[in-house]
From Swiss-Prot:
Pfam families: KOW (PF00467), ribosomal_L24 (PF17136). The keyword rRNA-binding applies. One of two assembly initiator proteins, it binds directly to the 5'-end of the 23S rRNA, where it nucleates assembly of the 50S subunit. One of the proteins that surrounds the polypeptide exit tunnel on the outside of the subunit. This is Large ribosomal subunit protein uL24. Belongs to the universal ribosomal protein uL24 family. Coiled coil: none annotated. Part of the 50S ribosomal subunit. The keyword Ribosomal protein applies. GO terms for biological process: translation.
């Protein structure tokens, strides 16, 4: 299946604890069907002290399921993603809400 959500996309959370929050995707894990979104789904991790790193409680992003996020369109609303083949044969992502091409 083609990647509808890619690194660098601006997305909005559709359900869960962070519903309505937006952020940028900085990692996609297609095998797991999950993505890491900056500033969303923050969890606390207790880090044990090592020689290189000090211990303590760290805040970091946790993966969120791809079904719970949607790309934000140019109008600021969530949109589904489709694909269109252009005249020169290249495949581009298209916002279903507006029909506009998605950069990337």
């Amino acid at each position: 299946m083609a990647a509808k959500i890619r690194k660098g996309d601006k997305v909005i959370v559709l359900s869960g604890r962070d519903k309505g929050r937006t952020g940028e995707v900085f990692e996609v894990r297609p095998a797991e069907g999950r993505a890491l979104v900056r500033g969303v789904n923050i969890v606390k991790r207790h880090q044990k002290q090592t020689q290189n790193q000090e211990g303590g409680i760290l805040s970091k992003e946790s993966p969120i399921d791809l079904s719970n996020i949607a790309i934000v369109g140019k109008d600021g609303k969530p949109t589904r993603v489709g694909f269109k083949i252009q005249a020169d044969g290249t495949k581009v992502r298209v916002a279903k809400r507006s029909g506009a091409e998605i950069d990337g």
